[in-house]
Amino acid sequence: MKLKPLNDRVLVKRLETEEKTAGGLYIPDTAKEKPSKGQVVAVGPGKVGDNGERTALAVKAGDEVLFNKYAGTEVKLDGVDHLVMREEDILAIID
């Protein structure tokens, strides 16, 4: 299935966290926090301003980003968890 975000929305695939701690202990799925780091899969065309002009987004497909813990709406595409969120919910682009 293909999903194309609208306006200032961004489709992000969560990046998985480590399965074990630095001390070698394995973390069960029930104890893991959902990661707030992901990779941008697709972006919308941008937000329409009051003047009617569309402003392009700062993020692009392939960017690795940090986002708010409770950002976006969860969707499952081809069995993989993704989030659809507004660009303003993205805190930073990781270089």
Swiss-Prot record:
Gene3D superfamilies reported in the protein's UniProt record: GroES chaperonin
Stored Pfam families: Cpn10
GO molecular function annotations of the record: ATP binding; metal ion binding; protein folding chaperone; protein-folding chaperone binding; unfolded protein binding
Cellular component annotations (GO), alphabetically ordered: cytoplasm
Location of the protein in the cell: Cytoplasm
Residues that span the membrane, as ranges: none
Keywords linked to the UniProt accession: Chaperone, Cytoplasm
Matches recorded under InterPro entries: Chaperonin_GroES (IPR020818), Chaperonin_GroES_sf (IPR037124), Chaprnonin_Cpn10_CS (IPR018369), GroES-like_sf (IPR011032)
Disulfide partners: none
Tagged with keyword Cytoplasm: yes
GO biological processes: chaperone cofactor-dependent protein refolding
Main localization of the protein described in the UniProt heading: cytoplasm
Family that this chain belongs to: Belongs to the GroES chaperonin family.
Function: Together with the chaperonin GroEL, plays an essential role in assisting protein folding. The GroEL-GroES system forms a nano-cage that allows encapsulation of the non-native substrate proteins and provides a physical environment optimized to promote and accelerate protein folding. GroES binds to the apical surface of the GroEL ring, thereby capping the opening of the GroEL channel.
Subunit structure: Heptamer of 7 subunits arranged in a ring. Interacts with the chaperonin GroEL.
UniProt-listed NCBIfam families: PRK00364.1-2 (NF001527), PRK00364.2-2 (NF001531), PRK00364.2-4 (NF001533), PRK00364.2-5 (NF001534)
Protein name: Co-chaperonin GroES
